[in-house]
Swiss-Prot record:
The keyword Cell cycle applies. GO terms for biological process: cell division; regulation of cell shape. Divisome component that associates with the complex late in its assembly, after the Z-ring is formed, and is dependent on DivIC and PBP2B for its recruitment to the divisome. Together with EzrA, is a key component of the system that regulates PBP1 localization during cell cycle progression. Its main role could be the removal of PBP1 from the cell pole after pole maturation is completed. Also contributes to the recruitment of PBP1 to the division complex. Not essential for septum formation. Belongs to the GpsB family. Forms polymers through the coiled coil domains. Interacts with PBP1, MreC and EzrA. One of its GO terms (cellular component) is cytoplasm. The keyword Coiled coil applies. It comes from Shouchella clausii (strain KSM-K16). This is Cell cycle protein GpsB.
Amino acid sequence: MSQMEIKLTAKEILDKDFKQSMRGYNQDEVDKFLDTVIQDYEAFQKKIEQLERENELLKQDLKKQTERPQRSQTVTTPSAGSTNYDILQRLSNLEKKVFGSKMYE
């Protein structure tokens, strides 16, 4: 999306004085100024729409990123109790193989 340059600030709009001709304000000057204001509003609207889309994409990415670690942690992290039990079971099996039935006599 091409960047549209913003031509007016709020202060410039507030401080704008139109020169008066014999029948009131110079119509061409007022029309040009209003055209510039309209262009700025259009530029603001496009920028807002772009930022809203970008914001939505970032929210979706963040949601995906926060879901991934939770799933992997629950799958890969066994509880401490089951890990200790597995170690004790392996140790017991190893003792039986190394020492045989002598241990239990």
